[in-house]
A protein has these predicted regions:
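Short, solvent-exposed loop/linker segments at beta-strand-coil boundaries, enriched for Pro/Gly
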Residues: 44-56
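Short, basic/aromatic beta-hairpin or loop at an interaction surface
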Residues: 37-45
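Intrinsically disordered, low-complexity regulatory regions in eukaryotic proteins
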Residues: 1-27, 31-37, 53, 57-60, ...
């Protein structure tokens, strides 16, 4: 992150646990790094595949918000579990009393002369599929790890 960035996002990659016929989500934390009110908008290369809530918002100075990106249930696995989808998070400074519903239509339009910062986020699918017969063993191992780490 450079000091001049209006907002920072974590994680910097959207990671979805991919299962056929199941919806899954990833939360992004958006942090306003300035003393200004900052408006944001989320765009994606695959709008039919994802729900983004909120997809537009205003973050108060030094505050943060959570954006939930939901991957819709898919009918087939992508080739090699690779995902070429991308997200773009645009941000710009707005006046202090701006409400998300009051944002002008051209807020995120560079041609209007607005100064827009853009942050690109990649998408990664994590396979939840496991070889036959090993899923129970994996589940007991991972729950065992959780038990031992919580003491």
């Amino acid at each position: 992150m450079t000091a001049s960035q209006l907002i920072s996002v974590s994680p910097d990659e959207l990671r979805f646990h991919f299962e056929l016929e199941k919806q899954t989500f990833c939360d992004l934390k958006v942090l306003n790094n300035t003393q200004n009110h900052v408006a944001f908008k989320v765009k994606t290369t695959s709008p039919k595949k994802y729900f983004v809530r909120p997809n537009t918002g205003v973050v108060h100075p030094w505050d943060s918000c959570i954006i939930r990106v939901t991957l819709q249930a898919q009918r087939e696995y992508p080739p090699d579990m690779q995902c070429k989808d991308k997200f773009l998070l645009q941000s710009t400074i707005v006046s202090p009393n701006t409400d998300v519903d009051d944002l002008p239509a051209d807020t995120f339009n560079k041609e209007s002369g607005n100064s827009i910062e853009e942050l690109k986020l990649r998408v990664a699918y994590i396979s939840t599929a496991s070889p036959e017969g090993s899923s129970e063993d994996d589940a007991s191992r991972s729950s065992h790890k959780l038990d031992s780490s919580s003491h």
